[in-house]
């Protein structure tokens, strides 16, 4: 993949993150991009670990839907 495609992919992900609720975006960013554990995210956000898991699950679904709707198939 080319540098231009990589930049495009990053922009797609950035735009999809902006489409999430703030709490979902926070959980996704901390867990997947910063490698923070679910328990630590719960402590940081002040929400129960089970709720963090729900936000991660819902956020991932929304990201996948957004990216597919905008032409990203995972192979670009």
Model-predicted segments: where are they?
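C-terminal edge and immediately downstream basic/flexible tail or linker adjoining helix-turn-helix-like DNA-binding
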Residues: 15, 43-46, 61-76
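Helix-turn-helix DNA-binding motif, specifically the short coil turn and the N-cap/start of the second
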Residues: 37, 46-51
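The N-cap/first-turn positions of alpha helices
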Residues: 23-24
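A short pre-motif secondary-structure segment
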Residues: 27-31
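Residues within the DNA-recognition helix of helix-turn-helix
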Residues: 55-58
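Acidic, proline/glycine-rich intrinsically disordered inter-domain spacer in sigma factors
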Residues: 1-18
């Amino acid at each position: 993949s080319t540098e231009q495609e990589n930049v495009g992919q990053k922009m797609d992900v950035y735009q999809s993150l902006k489409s999430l609720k703030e709490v979902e975006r926070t959980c996704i960013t901390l867990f997947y991009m910063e490698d923070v554990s679910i328990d630590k995210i719960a402590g940081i956000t002040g929400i129960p670990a089970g709720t963090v898991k729900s936000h991660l699950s819902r956020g991932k679904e929304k990201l996948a839907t957004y990216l597919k709707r905008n032409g990203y198939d995972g192979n670009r």
